[in-house]
Amino acid sequence: EPGHDVQLLGVIRPGEPAGEMSLIADAPHSADVVALRDSEIIAVPRDVFLEACEADTAVMIELAKLMMLRSRQAVTRGGAGEPSVFGFISLGSGLLRPLVDRLAREIAGLGYSVTAIGSEVQSAPTEWFSDVERTHDFVLYVAEAPDSGWRHLVARQVDRLFHVGRGDRNPPRSGAGAAAALASPLQAQQLVDLILLHTPDTSRPSGSEAWLDVARPARLFHLRRDHDADIARMARILTGQSVGLVLSGGGARAYAHIGAVRALRERGVPIDFLGGVSMGAVVAAGVAMGWGDAEMERRIREAFVTTSPLDDIAVPLLAMTHGMKVNERLAHHFGDVQIADLWLPFFCVSSNLTTGAYQVHRRGLLREALRASISLPGVLPPATSDNNVLVDGAVLKNFPADVMRASQLGPIV
């Protein structure tokens, strides 16, 4: 609608109809259809369709099933479907094919049929690409050469696109801009992600904010070369088996999250995405920082249990405390780490009193996002950001499982 952001309602797969509701109701279309990939369309006149329905009632029954399925998907916002064809486009120099081949082997180890394809098939006919999709569970296209024709072809053949850059270098602004332009239909639907590659000895990523500004990805992933756990995590993400952990607020009760994280680790359950609210956000941030069980317990106890961070009592104009001790402890334990520089994708939620809606923090200083998420009204002074007043996320959304679902397709704990 005019004045509103574009919203993805669903994905029409090969062989499925588009515009069936408008055809049956003999009314104008209620949405636009955008070709994310190279497509061939067959137009069926209304009278021909009605004749087919009269000749075989199964046509209308199957169409009704599809319409009901799409209606449910629109309500649950689950219409994007599960992608099975992925593209990997290199930003800058560096070999990309070995990484994609390794991802393919990892996916095959999960029991799927998968193939990795490079520019050697650039001149193949359209039918060939369709046949590859039909005969494999997952298809991975690789574009690492400077051949713009192959890059454009990859962007027109995939369900989801990954730009791949080197995390130890600044983003190549011209290359990233060209990549964003060729992926514009996918980019508009938030179907373009960014992978930053790091050396095996990298302790923590840095400078990721610059990459976000240039590439404008829907999601950011960090991978260390030759790091088995990172490759396995990426394979789970591609196959829809990634695990998202969401931790709610609840004050002192949120300390139970530490035990929950430990139990998941003891059971060998991977944690691939993290999100949280209030104290749950603090614990989730610790996991994203890479804290082990012992370090997590020590830091949380030191910051919030051994001595109270809420004993800097203030004249209660804004809150009962000044909030300075909380600020100091967040700074001590999380430093100047940016959310984009965490090894695992992370978000936390605060309540925006200015707009009356919850606010999701995926960028910026981690400690500032946490400070907003734990700002319990009346106890801590509210946080401010861009002239917005932010308080504890639990005020409006204490369990943001739906936010996590929008980020990944796998199980959510």
Language-model-derived ranges and their functions:
Residues D101-R134:
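Conserved substrate/cofactor phosphate-moiety recognition/catalytic segment
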